[in-house]
């Protein structure tokens, strides 16, 4: 009886393995033929806005007297490029068969979409990218910049007269030598880096495990939250208030300042070197405290659980 029961099980297992092998071989053959093809789009109506949605391709903007879009693609990842209603639209589409998603040999080949256009000021820029990087040089400026990426990185040196809104999963966010009205940055495990950035209004940053690194940054107010990410400030000047809430991440500031500071962390340490004196209220359950006594300046409230607290004034 047991032998009779075992026979169908063996047959089913053989069929399952054989079927999987066939699908895997089909996907392998398909991947071997997945060559990269380059296409150019020159006959485009004038545009001042951008609506770009990509799957695996990197996106790069390049200064050029000639306006064109150069697309690298494979037979598995195709693109449509159009220009209508003053908007350049680039849409990537994954057309793999379902079994090719299961057996993924060499599918993520290096491909890129490059937008060539004259230097100058443009309207809104919207980008969605799954695994590709987004790179924007300083030759361009935009009225607004909105981007959502998964594993790709965002690297921009472009000024924005309006707001910058970036959402990333594991990708890194880097802005350097730019101005903007407001910044709202969210990342899961990716780091966030701002260098030589001047923001008229507020900067808001939120991550899970990613670190924040700000250098030579100015803004009206700053707010951030993180689980395990560290916060590092170097020459960061905030007109109004700095609000930081961390779980286990450290907070370190050098040559930085704000009218008021409110910092909370659990196991991370807090080490501040502020430009002007503050009235410091430091609270820690088991951590050590080394803070100066001052009766002038704005409030500086610091609360940790086990993290040490150190505060110094430059003046």
Indicate where each model-derived feature is located.
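Eukaryotic tandem repeat interaction scaffolds
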Residues: 203-260, 268
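Acidic (Asp/Glu) and glycine-rich low-complexity loops/linkers
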Residues: 1-149, 153-168, 174-187, 193-206, ...
């Amino acid at each position: 009886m047991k032998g009779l029961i075992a026979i169908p099980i063996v047959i089913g297992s053989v069929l399952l393995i054989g079927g999987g092998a066939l699908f895997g071989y089909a996907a392998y053959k398909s991947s071997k033929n997945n060559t990269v093809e380059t296409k150019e789009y020159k006959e485009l109506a004038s545009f001042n806005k951008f609506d770009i949605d990509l799957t695996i391709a990197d996106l790069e903007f390049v200064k050029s007297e000639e306006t064109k879009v150069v697309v690298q693609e494979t037979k598995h990842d195709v693109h449509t490029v159009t220009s209508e209603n003053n908007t350049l639209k680039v849409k990537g589409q994954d057309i793999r068969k379902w079994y090719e998603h299961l057996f993924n040999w060499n599918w993520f080949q290096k491909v890129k979409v490059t937008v060539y256009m004259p230097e100058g000021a443009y309207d809104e820029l919207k980008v969605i990218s799954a695994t590709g990087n987004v790179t924007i040089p300083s030759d361009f400026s935009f009225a607004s910049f909105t981007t959502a990426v998964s594993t790709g990185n965002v690297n921009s040196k472009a000024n924005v007269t309006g707001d910058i809104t970036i959402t990333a999963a594991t990708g890194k966010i880097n802005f350097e030598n730019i101005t903007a009205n407001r910044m709202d940055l969210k990342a899961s495990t990716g780091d966030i880096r701002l260098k030589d950035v001047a923001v008229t209004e507020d900067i808001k940053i939120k991550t899970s495990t990613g670190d924040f690194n700000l250098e030579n940054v100015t803004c009206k107010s700053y707010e951030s939250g993180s689980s395990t990410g560290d916060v590092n400030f170097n020459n960061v000047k905030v007109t109004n208030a700095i609000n930081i809430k961390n779980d286990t991440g450290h907070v370190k500031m050098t040559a930085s300042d704000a009218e008021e500071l409110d910092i909370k962390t659990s196991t991370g340490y807090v080490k501040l070197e502020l430009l002007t004196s503050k009235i410091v209220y430091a609270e820690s359950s088991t951590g050590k405290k080394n803070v100066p006594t001052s009766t002038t300046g704005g409030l500086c409230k610091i609360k940790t659980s086990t993290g040490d607290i150190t505060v110094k004034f430059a003046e």
